[in-house]
Amino acid sequence: MSTLVQCGYFERGQCQSCRHIKLPMAQQLAAKTQELQQLLAPFVDNAEAQFLPPVVGDSSGFRNKAKMVVLGAAHAPVLGIVSPSGEAVSLCDCLLYPADMQALLHRLERFVQQAGIPPYRVDKAKGELKFILLTRSQVRGEYMLRFVLRSRDAIARIERELPALMAEYPQIKVVSVNLQPIHMAILEGEEEIFLTENTRLEERFNDVPLFIRPKSFFQTNPQVAAKLYQTAREWVADFAPASLWDLFCGVGGFGLHCAAKDIPLTGIEIEAEAIACAKMSAQLMGLDKVQFMALDSTDFAKGDAAQTKPELIIVNPPRRGIGESLCHSLSEFAPKAILYSSCNPKTLAKDLGHIRGYRLTKVQLFDLFPHSDHFEVLALLVKD
Protein backbone atom coordinates (compact mmCIF):
# COMPACT_ATOMS: atom_id res chain seq x y z
CA MET A 1 0.00 0.00 0.00
CA SER A 2 2.97 2.32 0.40
CA THR A 3 4.01 1.81 -3.23
CA LEU A 4 4.94 4.90 -5.20
CA VAL A 5 4.51 4.86 -8.97
CA GLN A 6 7.39 6.58 -10.77
CA CYS A 7 5.96 8.35 -13.82
CA GLY A 8 8.29 10.17 -16.19
CA TYR A 9 5.43 12.08 -17.82
CA PHE A 10 4.46 13.54 -14.45
CA GLU A 11 8.06 14.25 -13.45
CA ARG A 12 8.64 16.17 -16.68
CA GLY A 13 5.40 18.14 -16.29
CA GLN A 14 4.01 16.68 -19.53
CA CYS A 15 0.90 15.06 -18.04
CA GLN A 16 -0.85 15.95 -14.80
CA SER A 17 -3.85 13.60 -15.11
CA CYS A 18 -2.71 11.48 -12.15
CA ARG A 19 -2.41 14.44 -9.83
CA HIS A 20 -1.71 12.36 -6.69
CA ILE A 21 0.78 9.92 -8.21
CA LYS A 22 3.57 11.24 -5.95
CA LEU A 23 1.65 10.19 -2.85
CA PRO A 24 1.90 6.63 -1.48
CA MET A 25 -1.27 4.62 -2.13
CA ALA A 26 -2.04 4.41 1.60
CA GLN A 27 -2.00 8.20 1.82
CA GLN A 28 -4.23 8.54 -1.26
CA LEU A 29 -6.74 6.10 0.25
CA ALA A 30 -6.72 7.86 3.61
CA ALA A 31 -7.61 11.17 1.92
CA LYS A 32 -10.43 9.57 -0.09
CA THR A 33 -11.79 7.80 2.98
CA GLN A 34 -11.77 11.03 4.98
CA GLU A 35 -13.64 12.88 2.22
CA LEU A 36 -16.26 10.13 2.01
CA GLN A 37 -16.79 9.98 5.77
CA GLN A 38 -17.19 13.76 5.99
CA LEU A 39 -19.73 13.85 3.15
CA LEU A 40 -21.81 11.00 4.56
CA ALA A 41 -21.52 11.98 8.24
CA PRO A 42 -25.10 13.40 8.33
CA PHE A 43 -26.46 9.98 7.30
CA VAL A 44 -24.53 7.67 9.64
CA ASP A 45 -25.85 8.77 13.00
CA ASN A 46 -27.38 5.35 13.63
CA ALA A 47 -25.28 2.73 15.38
CA GLU A 48 -25.99 0.24 12.60
CA ALA A 49 -24.04 2.09 9.89
CA GLN A 50 -20.78 0.40 8.90
CA PHE A 51 -17.88 1.95 7.00
CA LEU A 52 -16.19 -1.14 5.58
CA PRO A 53 -12.46 -1.19 4.66
CA PRO A 54 -11.72 0.25 1.19
CA VAL A 55 -11.20 -2.14 -1.71
CA VAL A 56 -8.09 -1.59 -3.82
CA GLY A 57 -6.31 -3.12 -6.79
CA ASP A 58 -3.02 -2.60 -8.57
CA SER A 59 -1.55 0.90 -8.69
CA SER A 60 -0.38 0.52 -12.31
CA GLY A 61 -1.31 -1.53 -15.38
CA PHE A 62 -4.96 -1.62 -14.34
CA ARG A 63 -6.73 0.47 -16.98
CA ASN A 64 -8.57 -1.21 -19.86
CA LYS A 65 -9.32 1.86 -22.01
CA ALA A 66 -7.13 4.42 -23.76
CA LYS A 67 -8.49 7.64 -25.27
CA MET A 68 -5.68 9.07 -27.37
CA VAL A 69 -5.73 12.42 -29.11
CA VAL A 70 -3.97 12.07 -32.47
CA LEU A 71 -1.40 14.85 -32.84
CA GLY A 72 1.65 15.64 -34.93
CA ALA A 73 1.61 15.05 -38.68
CA ALA A 74 0.80 12.16 -41.03
CA HIS A 75 4.51 11.30 -41.37
CA ALA A 76 5.13 11.60 -37.61
CA PRO A 77 1.89 11.01 -35.66
CA VAL A 78 1.71 11.19 -31.88
CA LEU A 79 -0.92 9.40 -29.78
CA GLY A 80 -1.41 11.16 -26.48
CA ILE A 81 -2.16 14.65 -25.24
CA VAL A 82 -1.15 18.26 -25.57
CA SER A 83 1.03 19.08 -22.55
CA PRO A 84 0.47 22.18 -20.37
CA SER A 85 3.29 23.84 -22.34
CA GLY A 86 1.60 23.07 -25.66
CA GLU A 87 3.78 20.21 -26.94
CA ALA A 88 2.44 16.96 -28.41
CA VAL A 89 3.25 14.17 -25.94
CA SER A 90 2.99 10.47 -26.77
CA LEU A 91 1.34 8.60 -23.89
CA CYS A 92 1.87 5.11 -25.31
CA ASP A 93 3.99 4.22 -22.26
CA CYS A 94 1.45 5.49 -19.71
CA LEU A 95 1.82 3.30 -16.62
CA LEU A 96 -1.94 2.96 -16.21
CA TYR A 97 -2.00 0.57 -19.21
CA PRO A 98 -0.88 -3.09 -19.19
CA ALA A 99 2.36 -3.82 -21.08
CA ASP A 100 0.60 -5.48 -24.03
CA MET A 101 -1.63 -2.42 -24.42
CA GLN A 102 1.38 -0.10 -24.37
CA ALA A 103 2.98 -2.16 -27.16
CA LEU A 104 -0.17 -2.01 -29.27
CA LEU A 105 -0.43 1.76 -28.82
CA HIS A 106 3.11 2.14 -30.17
CA ARG A 107 2.15 -0.08 -33.12
CA LEU A 108 -0.89 2.13 -33.76
CA GLU A 109 1.36 5.19 -34.02
CA ARG A 110 3.20 3.35 -36.82
CA PHE A 111 -0.12 2.29 -38.33
CA VAL A 112 -1.25 5.92 -38.66
CA GLN A 113 2.10 6.79 -40.23
CA GLN A 114 1.93 3.88 -42.69
CA ALA A 115 -1.65 4.74 -43.63
CA GLY A 116 -0.67 8.38 -44.10
CA ILE A 117 -3.69 9.75 -42.25
CA PRO A 118 -3.32 13.44 -41.33
CA PRO A 119 -4.13 14.15 -37.66
CA TYR A 120 -6.92 16.66 -37.16
CA ARG A 121 -5.60 20.14 -36.38
CA VAL A 122 -7.97 21.95 -34.04
CA ASP A 123 -6.28 25.31 -34.63
CA LYS A 124 -6.74 25.04 -38.41
CA ALA A 125 -9.89 22.87 -38.51
CA LYS A 126 -8.07 20.60 -40.97
CA GLY A 127 -7.02 16.97 -41.04
CA GLU A 128 -8.88 13.70 -40.58
CA LEU A 129 -7.96 11.56 -37.56
CA LYS A 130 -9.12 13.03 -34.25
CA PHE A 131 -8.85 10.21 -31.71
CA ILE A 132 -7.88 6.58 -31.37
CA LEU A 133 -9.90 4.72 -28.73
CA LEU A 134 -8.62 1.35 -27.58
CA THR A 135 -10.46 -0.98 -25.17
CA ARG A 136 -8.99 -4.19 -23.73
CA SER A 137 -10.87 -7.23 -22.46
CA GLN A 138 -9.08 -8.72 -19.46
CA VAL A 139 -10.60 -12.18 -19.87
CA ARG A 140 -8.77 -12.90 -23.14
CA GLY A 141 -6.56 -9.87 -23.71
CA GLU A 142 -8.61 -8.97 -26.80
CA TYR A 143 -9.15 -5.47 -28.17
CA MET A 144 -11.69 -3.11 -29.67
CA LEU A 145 -10.09 -0.40 -31.80
CA ARG A 146 -11.93 2.74 -32.89
CA PHE A 147 -10.76 5.52 -35.20
CA VAL A 148 -12.60 8.82 -34.75
CA LEU A 149 -12.51 10.63 -38.10
CA ARG A 150 -13.74 13.99 -39.37
CA SER A 151 -15.07 12.40 -42.58
CA ARG A 152 -15.06 9.19 -44.63
CA ASP A 153 -12.02 10.31 -46.62
CA ALA A 154 -9.46 8.25 -44.69
CA ILE A 155 -11.47 5.02 -44.35
CA ALA A 156 -9.91 3.48 -47.46
CA ARG A 157 -6.43 4.09 -46.06
CA ILE A 158 -7.36 2.39 -42.79
CA GLU A 159 -8.82 -0.58 -44.68
CA ARG A 160 -5.64 -0.84 -46.79
CA GLU A 161 -3.36 -1.20 -43.74
CA LEU A 162 -5.74 -3.13 -41.49
CA PRO A 163 -5.01 -6.72 -42.70
CA ALA A 164 -1.32 -6.40 -41.80
CA LEU A 165 -2.14 -4.97 -38.38
CA MET A 166 -4.65 -7.71 -37.56
CA ALA A 167 -2.27 -10.41 -38.78
CA GLU A 168 0.33 -9.05 -36.37
CA TYR A 169 -2.23 -8.54 -33.59
CA PRO A 170 -4.92 -11.25 -33.97
CA GLN A 171 -6.22 -10.24 -30.53
CA ILE A 172 -7.79 -7.16 -32.18
CA LYS A 173 -11.34 -8.45 -32.60
CA VAL A 174 -13.40 -5.31 -33.27
CA VAL A 175 -12.42 -2.36 -35.48
CA SER A 176 -14.67 0.57 -36.28
CA VAL A 177 -14.65 4.12 -37.57
CA ASN A 178 -16.64 6.77 -35.75
CA LEU A 179 -17.53 9.88 -37.74
CA GLN A 180 -17.34 13.14 -35.79
CA PRO A 181 -17.52 15.99 -38.34
CA ILE A 182 -18.15 18.82 -35.87
CA HIS A 183 -15.35 21.26 -35.05
CA MET A 184 -15.85 20.96 -31.30
CA ALA A 185 -14.25 19.12 -28.38
CA ILE A 186 -16.61 16.15 -28.72
CA LEU A 187 -15.12 12.68 -28.39
CA GLU A 188 -17.40 10.84 -30.79
CA GLY A 189 -20.22 11.31 -33.29
CA GLU A 190 -23.46 9.48 -34.02
CA GLU A 191 -22.35 7.24 -36.91
CA GLU A 192 -20.28 4.10 -36.31
CA ILE A 193 -18.93 2.10 -39.27
CA PHE A 194 -17.63 -1.39 -38.47
CA LEU A 195 -14.63 -2.66 -40.40
CA THR A 196 -14.82 -6.13 -38.84
CA GLU A 197 -17.61 -8.68 -38.80
CA ASN A 198 -17.49 -8.75 -35.01
CA THR A 199 -19.13 -5.71 -33.39
CA ARG A 200 -18.64 -6.44 -29.69
CA LEU A 201 -15.90 -7.35 -27.26
CA GLU A 202 -16.50 -10.10 -24.71
CA GLU A 203 -15.53 -9.63 -21.08
CA ARG A 204 -16.19 -11.67 -17.94
CA PHE A 205 -16.38 -10.43 -14.37
CA ASN A 206 -16.54 -13.25 -11.83
CA ASP A 207 -18.90 -15.76 -13.49
CA VAL A 208 -20.91 -13.18 -15.46
CA PRO A 209 -20.33 -12.72 -19.22
CA LEU A 210 -20.48 -9.06 -20.26
CA PHE A 211 -20.18 -7.41 -23.67
CA ILE A 212 -18.68 -4.10 -24.74
CA ARG A 213 -19.84 -2.22 -27.80
CA PRO A 214 -18.34 1.07 -29.02
CA LYS A 215 -20.72 3.43 -27.24
CA SER A 216 -21.66 1.42 -24.17
CA PHE A 217 -20.24 2.55 -20.81
CA PHE A 218 -17.91 0.07 -19.15
CA GLN A 219 -15.82 0.26 -15.97
CA THR A 220 -12.17 1.10 -16.72
CA ASN A 221 -10.61 -0.87 -13.84
CA PRO A 222 -11.68 -4.51 -14.29
CA GLN A 223 -9.82 -5.81 -11.24
CA VAL A 224 -11.64 -3.57 -8.76
CA ALA A 225 -14.90 -3.55 -10.75
CA ALA A 226 -15.13 -7.34 -10.36
CA LYS A 227 -14.87 -6.89 -6.58
CA LEU A 228 -17.50 -4.13 -6.71
CA TYR A 229 -19.99 -6.37 -8.53
CA GLN A 230 -19.27 -9.33 -6.25
CA THR A 231 -19.85 -7.18 -3.15
CA ALA A 232 -23.14 -5.92 -4.59
CA ARG A 233 -24.19 -9.53 -5.20
CA GLU A 234 -23.45 -10.47 -1.58
CA TRP A 235 -25.27 -7.46 -0.10
CA VAL A 236 -28.34 -8.06 -2.27
CA ALA A 237 -28.42 -11.79 -1.47
CA ASP A 238 -28.87 -10.98 2.23
CA PHE A 239 -32.36 -9.66 1.40
CA ALA A 240 -33.41 -12.54 -0.87
CA PRO A 241 -35.53 -10.13 -2.95
CA ALA A 242 -38.42 -11.55 -4.95
CA SER A 243 -37.91 -8.90 -7.66
CA LEU A 244 -35.18 -6.45 -8.70
CA TRP A 245 -34.75 -3.21 -10.62
CA ASP A 246 -31.37 -2.13 -11.96
CA LEU A 247 -31.58 1.55 -12.96
CA PHE A 248 -28.83 3.18 -15.07
CA CYS A 249 -27.84 -0.44 -15.65
CA GLY A 250 -25.32 0.03 -18.47
CA VAL A 251 -24.39 -3.39 -19.87
CA GLY A 252 -26.08 -5.03 -16.86
CA GLY A 253 -23.09 -5.65 -14.59
CA PHE A 254 -24.89 -5.11 -11.28
CA GLY A 255 -28.25 -6.65 -12.15
CA LEU A 256 -26.79 -9.74 -13.81
CA HIS A 257 -24.58 -10.39 -10.77
CA CYS A 258 -27.61 -10.17 -8.49
CA ALA A 259 -30.16 -11.97 -10.67
CA ALA A 260 -31.22 -15.60 -10.46
CA LYS A 261 -33.37 -17.81 -12.67
CA ASP A 262 -36.40 -17.41 -10.39
CA ILE A 263 -36.04 -13.65 -9.69
CA PRO A 264 -37.57 -11.13 -12.11
CA LEU A 265 -35.05 -8.42 -13.01
CA THR A 266 -35.80 -5.21 -14.89
CA GLY A 267 -32.80 -3.24 -16.17
CA ILE A 268 -33.14 0.31 -17.49
CA GLU A 269 -30.49 2.25 -19.42
CA ILE A 270 -30.85 5.09 -21.92
CA GLU A 271 -28.05 3.88 -24.22
CA ALA A 272 -29.48 1.30 -26.64
CA GLU A 273 -26.08 -0.28 -27.38
CA ALA A 274 -25.58 -1.09 -23.70
CA ILE A 275 -29.05 -2.65 -23.51
CA ALA A 276 -28.25 -4.86 -26.51
CA CYS A 277 -25.15 -6.07 -24.64
CA ALA A 278 -27.12 -6.73 -21.44
CA LYS A 279 -29.68 -8.81 -23.36
CA MET A 280 -26.90 -10.95 -24.87
CA SER A 281 -25.48 -11.62 -21.41
CA ALA A 282 -28.88 -12.58 -19.97
CA GLN A 283 -29.46 -14.98 -22.86
CA LEU A 284 -26.05 -16.62 -22.34
CA MET A 285 -26.79 -17.00 -18.63
CA GLY A 286 -30.18 -18.59 -19.32
CA LEU A 287 -32.08 -15.93 -17.38
CA ASP A 288 -35.69 -15.99 -18.60
CA LYS A 289 -37.22 -13.56 -16.11
CA VAL A 290 -35.03 -10.64 -17.15
CA GLN A 291 -36.01 -7.65 -19.24
CA PHE A 292 -33.67 -4.86 -20.29
CA MET A 293 -35.11 -1.69 -21.83
CA ALA A 294 -33.52 1.38 -23.42
CA LEU A 295 -35.33 4.12 -21.49
CA ASP A 296 -34.62 7.06 -19.23
CA SER A 297 -34.51 5.71 -15.66
CA THR A 298 -36.39 8.66 -14.12
CA ASP A 299 -39.14 8.52 -16.75
CA PHE A 300 -39.42 4.75 -16.35
CA ALA A 301 -39.90 5.05 -12.59
CA LYS A 302 -42.70 7.57 -13.13
CA GLY A 303 -44.48 5.52 -15.81
CA ASP A 304 -46.76 2.50 -15.78
CA ALA A 305 -43.96 0.35 -14.39
CA ALA A 306 -44.37 2.12 -11.06
CA GLN A 307 -47.41 -0.07 -10.44
CA THR A 308 -45.20 -3.16 -10.18
CA LYS A 309 -42.93 -2.24 -7.30
CA PRO A 310 -39.70 -4.24 -6.84
CA GLU A 311 -38.44 -5.54 -3.51
CA LEU A 312 -34.95 -4.16 -4.10
CA ILE A 313 -33.65 -1.38 -6.37
CA ILE A 314 -30.08 -0.93 -7.61
CA VAL A 315 -29.01 2.47 -8.97
CA ASN A 316 -25.68 3.22 -10.66
CA PRO A 317 -26.03 6.74 -12.07
CA PRO A 318 -23.50 8.93 -13.87
CA ARG A 319 -21.67 11.65 -11.93
CA ARG A 320 -24.72 13.90 -11.73
CA GLY A 321 -26.49 11.39 -9.45
CA ILE A 322 -30.11 10.24 -9.67
CA GLY A 323 -31.73 13.60 -8.90
CA GLU A 324 -34.50 14.70 -6.56
CA SER A 325 -37.37 13.42 -8.71
CA LEU A 326 -36.10 9.83 -8.81
CA CYS A 327 -35.21 10.00 -5.10
CA HIS A 328 -38.86 10.76 -4.35
CA SER A 329 -40.01 7.92 -6.63
CA LEU A 330 -37.74 5.42 -4.86
CA SER A 331 -39.01 6.57 -1.48
CA GLU A 332 -42.61 6.03 -2.64
CA PHE A 333 -41.87 2.54 -4.01
CA ALA A 334 -40.60 1.60 -0.52
CA PRO A 335 -38.48 -1.43 -1.49
CA LYS A 336 -36.77 -3.46 1.25
CA ALA A 337 -33.48 -1.87 0.29
CA ILE A 338 -31.79 0.46 -2.19
CA LEU A 339 -28.25 -0.30 -3.35
CA TYR A 340 -26.60 2.87 -4.62
CA SER A 341 -23.30 2.68 -6.53
CA SER A 342 -21.85 6.15 -7.01
CA CYS A 343 -18.81 7.57 -8.81
CA ASN A 344 -19.40 10.98 -7.19
CA PRO A 345 -19.76 11.06 -3.39
CA LYS A 346 -20.96 14.68 -3.48
CA THR A 347 -24.06 13.84 -5.55
CA LEU A 348 -24.52 10.65 -3.53
CA ALA A 349 -24.74 12.75 -0.35
CA LYS A 350 -27.14 15.16 -2.05
CA ASP A 351 -29.37 12.29 -3.19
CA LEU A 352 -29.34 10.65 0.25
CA GLY A 353 -30.79 13.88 1.60
CA HIS A 354 -33.82 13.43 -0.69
CA ILE A 355 -34.50 9.73 -0.04
CA ARG A 356 -37.02 9.40 2.79
CA GLY A 357 -37.74 6.47 5.10
CA TYR A 358 -34.36 4.75 4.79
CA ARG A 359 -31.25 4.40 6.91
CA LEU A 360 -27.71 3.97 5.66
CA THR A 361 -26.35 0.63 6.92
CA LYS A 362 -23.23 -0.11 4.85
CA VAL A 363 -20.72 2.01 2.94
CA GLN A 364 -17.64 0.81 1.11
CA LEU A 365 -15.11 2.69 -1.01
CA PHE A 366 -13.77 1.04 -4.18
CA ASP A 367 -10.62 2.67 -5.56
CA LEU A 368 -11.25 2.27 -9.28
CA PHE A 369 -9.27 5.42 -10.10
CA PRO A 370 -5.87 5.42 -8.32
CA HIS A 371 -3.82 8.64 -8.30
CA SER A 372 -6.93 10.77 -8.93
CA ASP A 373 -9.56 12.42 -6.74
CA HIS A 374 -12.19 9.97 -7.99
CA PHE A 375 -13.48 6.75 -6.49
CA GLU A 376 -16.57 4.54 -6.47
CA VAL A 377 -18.82 4.09 -3.43
CA LEU A 378 -21.28 1.32 -2.69
CA ALA A 379 -23.97 2.40 -0.21
CA LEU A 380 -26.76 0.23 1.20
CA LEU A 381 -30.01 1.85 2.33
CA VAL A 382 -32.49 -0.23 4.30
CA LYS A 383 -36.16 0.59 4.86
CA ASP A 384 -36.95 1.96 8.32
From Swiss-Prot:
Chemical reaction(s) catalysed: uridine(747) in 23S rRNA + S-adenosyl-L-methionine = 5-methyluridine(747) in 23S rRNA + S-adenosyl-L-homocysteine + H(+)
One Pfam match: tRNA_U5-meth_tr
Gene Ontology molecular function: 4 iron, 4 sulfur cluster binding; iron ion binding; rRNA (uridine-C5-)-methyltransferase activity
Keywords: 4Fe-4S, Iron, Iron-sulfur, Metal-binding, Methyltransferase, rRNA processing, S-adenosyl-L-methionine, Transferase
Major enzyme class: transferase
List of residues binding [4Fe-4S] cluster: C7, C15, C18, C94
Amino-acid biosynthesis keyword on record: no
Binding annotation for S-adenosyl-L-methionine: Q219, F248, E269, N316
InterPro entries: 23SrRNA_MeTrfase_RlmC, MeTrfase_TrmA_AS, MeTrfase_TrmA_CS, SAM-dependent_MTases_sf, U5_MeTrfase_fam
One BP term from GO: rRNA base methylation
EC number: 2.1.1.189
Active site, UniProt feature: C343 (nucleophile)
Keyword Transcription listed: no
UniProt xrefs under SUPFAM superfamilies: S-adenosyl-L-methionine-dependent methyltransferases (SSF53335)
PANTHER family: RNA M5U METHYLTRANSFERASE, TRNA (URACIL(54)-C(5))-METHYLTRANSFERASE
Family the UniProt entry places it in: Belongs to the class I-like SAM-binding methyltransferase superfamily. RNA M5U methyltransferase family. RlmC subfamily.
Purpose: Catalyzes the formation of 5-methyl-uridine at position 747 (m5U747) in 23S rRNA.
The protein, known as: 23S rRNA (uracil(747)-C(5))-methyltransferase RlmC
Species annotation: Shewanella sp. (strain MR-7)
Gene that this polypeptide is encoded by: rlmC
